[in-house]
C-alpha cells in the first residue's frame, strides 16, 4: 500500500520510513509531489498536521500522513512552538542554514537564562487522512533542556541544542536508532502506525 507523506523534507522522509518499518508496517511511504506549499494556518500542531494531510490526500488520492512538530521552550512561554521552523524569519538559503539561524536566535534569546530554567520539550502531532475521509491524530513529546552551544552533527533542526532527560548526548549526537526510540516524532508515529494498520486493513 502506498501512503504519501505530506512533506518534501528528505530528512523527515528518511526518519519516518525508519520508524514505520521498525513498527512492522508494510507500506511504501512516498514524498509529496511538487506543487504549491500548503499554508500552515493552524494555531496548534494538530491543526497544522491535519491541514497538510488533508491537502496531500486531496492532491494524490492516496492515504496521507503528516506531522507538525516543534520546540516548546518553558522560558519563552512555549515558543517557538508552531513557528519553530520559521523562528528566525529567514526564508532563503538551505535548510541547514535556516536551522543554524533558528538555533542562533534561540541561543541569543536564552543567553542569560540559567540551566535550571532552560527546560523545553519537542512536541509532535502526527495525522492520518484517507481519501474516504478518515482522520486520526496522535501525539508525542520529549522533555529535556537546552544547552548553551550546539553539539553533534546528526539530526536536524534544534537537535544540536537539545539534551533529552536521562541522556548524556544531544539528539544530534545520538544514532538514528537511538533518537527514533525516544523522539517525539517516533512516539507519535509509532502510535499512528497502529492506527494506519487498522485503517488500511478494515
Swiss-Prot record:
Keyword Ribosomal protein part of the UniProt annotation: no
Species, as recorded: Frankia alni (strain DSM 45986 / CECT 9034 / ACN14a)
Name the record gives this protein: dITP/XTP pyrophosphatase
Binding-site list for substrate: 7-12, 69, 156-159, 179, 184-185
Biological-process GO terms, alphabetical: nucleotide metabolic process; purine nucleoside triphosphate catabolic process
Active site feature: 68 (proton acceptor)
UniProt-listed Enzyme Commission number(s): 3.6.1.66
Family annotation (InterPro entries): dITP/XTP_pyrophosphatase, ITPase-like_fam, RdgB/HAM1
The protein's role, per its UniProt record: Pyrophosphatase that catalyzes the hydrolysis of nucleoside triphosphates to their monophosphate derivatives, with a high preference for the non-canonical purine nucleotides XTP (xanthosine triphosphate), dITP (deoxyinosine triphosphate) and ITP. Seems to function as a house-cleaning enzyme that removes non-canonical purine nucleotides from the nucleotide pool, thus preventing their incorporation into DNA/RNA and avoiding chromosomal lesions.
Subunit architecture: Homodimer.
Amino acid at each position: 500500500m502506498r501512503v504519501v507523506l505530506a512533506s518534501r523534507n528528505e530528512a523527515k522522509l528518511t526518519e519516518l520510513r525508519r520508524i514505520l518499518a521498525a513498527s512492522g508496517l508494510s507500506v511504501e511511504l512516498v514524498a509529496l509531489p511538487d506543487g504549491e506549499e500548503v499554508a500552515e494556518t493552524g494555531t496548534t500542531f494538530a491543526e497544522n498536521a491535519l491541514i497538510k494531510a488533508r491537502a496531500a490526500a486531496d492532491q494524490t488520492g492516496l492515504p496521507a500522513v503528516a506531522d507538525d512538530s516543534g520546540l516548546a521552550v518553558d522560558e519563552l512561554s512555549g515558543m517557538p512552538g508552531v513557528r519553530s521552523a520559521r523562528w528566525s524569519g529567514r526564508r532563503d538559503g538551505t535548510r541547514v542554514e535556516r536551522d543554524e539561524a533558528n538555533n542562533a536566535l534561540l541561543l541569543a534569546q536564552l543567553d542569560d537564562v540559567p540551566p535550571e530554567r532552560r527546560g523545553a520539550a519537542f512536541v509532535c502531532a502526527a495525522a492520518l487522512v484517507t481519501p474516504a475521509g478518515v482522520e486520526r491524530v496522535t501525539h508525542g513529546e520529549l522533555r529535556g533542556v537546552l544547552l548553551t552551544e550546539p553539539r553533534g552533527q546528526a539530526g536536524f533542526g534544534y537537535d544540536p541544542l537539545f539534551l533529552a532527560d536521562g541522556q548524556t548526548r544531544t539528539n544530534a549526537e545520538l544514532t538514528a536508532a537511538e533518537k527514533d526510540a525516544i523522539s517525539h516524532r517516533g512516539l507519535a508515529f509509532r502510535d499512528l502506525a497502529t492506527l494506519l494498520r487498522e485503517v488500511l486493513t478494515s
